[in-house]
């Protein structure tokens, strides 16, 4: 009887390691492997400062991330080896207030 070997198909789980910037508040760098910044441009690393480990997490089976789009993160990690998460733009509370006041005044004029 002939023995047949079936190759094992290993699914490579996608993990990422997230580092916090020491220079910029609310700025995070996602890389594929812990302490491997070899694919991150030198200029970016200089501006980022000393990376501070924030967390490691699996991306497979995950539906979303808190402050980043999951598919963009996966694509960036695959294509360029890193993903940079910048802080959200600051809220312009004065503009929001003036806008709501303007809307309320226009309703009062009717």
Swiss-Prot record:
Residues 97-110 have a biased composition (Polar residues). It comes from Salmonella typhi. This is Protein YcgL. Residues 88-110 are annotated as: Disordered. Residues 14-98 form the YcgL domain. Pfam families: YcgL. HAMAP family: UPF0745.
